[in-house]
Amino acid sequence: EEQLYDQQYIDGFTENWDAMKAHLKDFTPEKMAEFCGIDADSLRAVARDFADAKSARMFWGMGVSQHIHGTDNSRCLISLALMCGQVGRPGTGLHPLRGQNNVQGASDAGLIPMFLPDYQSVTDEGVRSAFNEIWQSDNILDQKGLTVTEIMDAVHEGDISAMYILGENPAMSDPDVGHARDALAKLDHLVVQDIFLTETANYADVILPASAWAEKTGTVTNTNRQVQMGRPAIAPPGQAKEDWWITVELAKRLGLNWAYEGPREVFAEMKRSMKSLENITWELSLIHISEPTRRAI
């Protein structure tokens, strides 16, 4: 109603603005005040501050994203930043803060169902061919996998009867906890690999004791893309093992010829397929370094 949007930015860098504008027409501050518990005048004041600022930046965390409609929440914030032109300039941007210490590193390494490492599409034949060669495989599927919530739906639908969960606690963190717990209870077999007897581990048929951060060697990458080395301060207790060791031993028992002797060899393989790590070496581990490096750019 006050035309606070940045028309020049919208025209140059966005699509479907007319449809978005028409969609938002009925969402007045007065109407939204009933839903969010903030009066209309305050909503207008915040909108003016954000839109009129020379530079404005958004940060959000799990309170926004870990909902059954978390993706839509994030898309709304992205659209808001785009329509106000608060993207692509110093002091602007969007920063979805992760919930744990290495979500960025795990995502970089391919723990997203539609991507292989370094956000390379699993549907790209050239990408799959390269990874088939690196991993000595010939059967990487050309279809994206399932998200955590989709996995739980698939269990209820009878498409999944067994799961192997590493370092995750969906019985507590899933947006619909009851739905997730019912799914875990329906499984024929559940393996959980973790450092604690979590709510999810209570549903497990087999528990593999993993090691904590201070008990193992490896790297983590934060949201600022800093790759940092961790080294063990103490040995893992009891029968606990490092995650890479458990994975390799399971692979060997399944008949795979995996010969990794430690995280260093795993990191070397990652560098072969991830240009973001191109100029980062194990020898640089005395310092932290950010990716993508100058050479990778």
PLM ranges: what are they?
Residues 1-102, 122-286:
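Cofactor-pocket helix-loop regions in the catalytic cores of large enzyme subunits
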Residues 102, 109-114, 118:
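Surface-exposed loop and adjacent secondary-structure segments within mature catalytic domains
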Residues 109-110, 126, 295:
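Disordered, low-complexity tails and leader-like regions
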Residues 287-297:
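Single conserved hydrophobic/aromatic residue that forms the stacking wall/gate
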